[in-house]
Swiss-Prot record:
The N-terminal region may be exposed to the interior of the granule, whereas the C-terminal portion may be embedded in the membrane. During phagocytosis and degranulation, proteases may be released and activated and cleave BPI at the junction of the N- and C-terminal portions of the molecule, providing controlled release of the N-terminal antibacterial fragment when bacteria are ingested. This is Bactericidal permeability-increasing protein. CDD domains: BPI1 (cd00025), BPI2 (cd00026). Residues 240-245 are annotated as: Cleavage sites for elastase. The gene is BPI. GO terms for biological process: defense response to Gram-negative bacterium; innate immune response; lipopolysaccharide-mediated signaling pathway; negative regulation of interleukin-6 production; negative regulation of interleukin-8 production; negative regulation of macrophage activation; negative regulation of tumor necrosis factor production. Residues 32-42 are annotated as: Central sheet, part 1.
Length: 487
């Protein structure tokens, strides 16, 4: 039987989870480099295709087939009318599907060798003679092809998806009329009937696909977190800075990837670097976080004045020989005990410059610079400044992904001290080395790591969970590879 084709706007079902991730990747040749990039591999698209096919199958089974009526004229019998009605889809099999990339355009979602089984009723009338019965319709070798165009909303920074075209093809349609004295009469017109039902199914399928894209897939795209609030100080801008770009093997999109202040949005005084992704395809999703992304976090929190803490003696284990008291400090700085006898000491630690993180193939290196100011706590609870020192160090940062959040742990190397000011007279700053080497690991670092373990959310849409995560540091960016599951 001659192949038929229907075209119409395209629509897709609720396989949106991967498709939203599809719309967040990395095109590193833009005029403005992204701070965060996500790349979807063919493996990721294959998973999206599986999810999409399962969802589409449910949607297509809900197709309502309109009644079909026509007239007939047979020599010696004259004219009559017949109708096919109450048609229901009993089975809609979609055995093979694929999402492929169309370079510089978007995606193509295709299904081949679909089979449909439909049951319904028929009736015929010739003057006062009425006949009726049941029928079964079998559609074999149906193919569906939908072109999906990906874009971005320049105002909201969210991804968009539209269906630029949809087509369906049916290889064969067969109608079987139930036993009836006049069933043979309907069989005389089976080609006409099959052609009419073929056209109706083609148009209904593309209409259903189109409605799914606009009513389900596009709204799901809006669940992608763009402006994500972290706390009262900062949030993350995950908005797209360019429309998604496709090649023959990958789908890439650029995201701003920048921490911002909840109080004021000033652009950082540095720019994102270029990220050159390696050729990797064994994970569904690849996420690149540039050092720009991390360093905007340090800038925002330092400018907000929240990178600080106060250390007191009651925070030190009782069994420790190191104490934050003027008596203990007097053992190596006699002037402290002389001027402020038998008093507690408070130490205020604050970032003097925004902390800087460097990402290299060898790992993540952290460069904090802090001011450490010591005060004697007077009997009236007021504070008397003792000295101010600068403290520099380098550290290594270990990161991982837990529950779709990026978490970290900081380890510090040797502390380098510099005396900036003293109210107790000049002294060798090396005298403070032991006490700093003690209080930083047991008081400062645990509190920093407690914050880092809370982490911050990665740009994943609703109901998508990352697993099987691998991390690799590269020049200027950290690369995550992960598989995903839609829950």
């Amino acid at each position: 039987m001659r192949e038929n084709m229907a075209r119409g706007p395209c629509n897709a079902p609720r396989w949106a989870s991967l498709m939203v991730l599809v719309a967040i990747g990395t095109a590193v040749t833009a005029a403005v480099n992204p701070g965060v990039v996500v790349r979807i591999s063919q493996k990721g698209l294959d998973y999206a295709s599986q999810q999409g096919t399962a969802a589409l199958q449910k949607e297509l089974k809900r197709i309502k087939i309109p009644d079909y009526s026509d007239s007939f004229k047979i020599k010696h019998l004259g004219k009559g009318h017949y109708s096919f009605y109450s048609m229901d889809i009993r089975e809609f099999q979609l055995p093979s599907s694929q999402i492929s990339m169309v370079p510089n355009v978007g995606l193509k979602f295709s299904i081949s060798n679909a089979n449909i089984k439909i049951s319904g009723k028929w009736k015929a009338q010739k003057r006062f003679l009425k006949m009726s019965g049941n029928f079964d319709l079998s559609i074999e070798g149906m193919s569906i092809s939908a072109d999906l165009k990906l874009g971005s909303n320049p105002t909201s920074g969210k991804p968009t998806i539209t269906c630029s075209s949809c087509s369906s093809h049916i290889n064969s349609v067969h109608v079987h009329i139930s036993k009836s004295k006049v069933g043979w009469l309907i069989q005389l017109f089976h080609k006409k009937i099959e052609s009419a039902l073929r056209n109706k199914m083609n148009s209904q399928v593309c209409e259903k696909v189109t409605n799914s894209v606009s009513s389900e897939l596009q709204p799901y795209f809006q669940t992608l977190p763009v402006m994500t609030k972290i706390d009262s100080v900062a949030g993350i801008n995950y908005g797209l800075v360019a429309p998604p770009a496709t090649t023959a093997e990958t789908l890439d999109v650029q995201m701003k990837g920048e921490f911002y202040s909840e109080n004021h949005h000033n652009p950082p005084p540095f720019a994102p670097p270029v990220m050159e992704f390696p050729a990797a395809h064994d994970r569904m999703v690849y996420l690149g976080l540039s050092d720009y992304f991390f360093n905007t976090a340090g800038l925002v929190y330092q400018e907000a004045g929240v990178l600080k803490m106060t250390l007191r003696d009651d925070m030190i284990p009782k069994e420790s020989k190191f104490r934050l008291t003027t008596k203990f400090f007097g053992t190596f700085l006699p002037e402290v005990a002389k001027k402020f006898p038998n008093m507690k000491i408070q130490i205020h630690v604050s970032a003097s410059t925004p902390p800087h993180l460097s990402v290299q193939p060898t790992g993540l290196t952290f460069y904090p610079a802090v001011d450490v100011q010591a005060f004697a706590v007077l009997p009236n609870s007021s504070l008397a400044s003792l000295f101010l020192i600068g403290m520099h160090t380098t550290g290594s940062m270990e990161v991982s992904a837990e529950s779709n959040r990026l978490v970290g742990e900081l380890k510090l190397d040797r502390l380098l001290l510099e005396l900036k000011h003293s109210n107790i007279g000049p002294f060798p700053v090396e005298l403070l080395q032991d006490i700093m080497n003690y209080i930083v690991p047991i008081l400062v670092l645990p509190r920093v790591n407690e914050k880092l373990q809370k982490g911050f959310p990665l740009p994943t849409p609703a109901r998508v969970q990352l697993y099987n995560v691998v991390l690799q540091p590269h020049q200027n960016f950290l690369l995550f590879g992960a598989d995903v599951v839609y829950k």
